[in-house]
């Protein structure tokens, strides 16, 4: 007897467990470089450091080769993401947005953060 599922399983997909930050960022960069149509990149934090620039440069390369890139960054976690970097990604054609800007209008908004990572 098969248990019904809300989601159909698609063959050809795979899951890989990444055990370190370095293997994660290598896999991210490879996935970005191999994208064929679009990239949805959502994250809590990107710093203007070697790792952050590595991922940003991969996204910019993708946009420059015609891939549609959507980039959503948490406003609180991304507070070190400079205006210069924002301009750089937008000039490359990346659709960039901040999630939940830090302007607090009620007591609940501070805890509404974008903690998931999607690529």
Regions found by a protein language model. Give the residues of each.
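N-terminal localization/anchoring segments of enzymes in phospholipid and broader phosphate metabolism
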Residues: 1-119
């Amino acid at each position: 007897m098969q248990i019904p599922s809300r989601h159909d399983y698609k063959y050809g997909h795979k899951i890989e467990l990444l055990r370190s930050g370095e293997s994660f960022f290598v896999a991210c960069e490879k996935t970005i470089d191999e994208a064929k149509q679009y990239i949805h990149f959502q994250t809590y934090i990107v710093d203007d450091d070697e790792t952050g620039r590595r991922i940003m440069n991969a996204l910019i390369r993708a946009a420059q080769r015609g891939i549609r890139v959507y980039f959503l960054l948490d406003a609180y976690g991304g507070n070190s993401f400079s205006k210069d970097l924002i301009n750089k990604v937008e000039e490359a054609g990346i659709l960039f947005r901040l999630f939940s800007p830090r302007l607090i209008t009620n007591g609940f908004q501070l805890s509404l953060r974008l903690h998931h990572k999607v690529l």
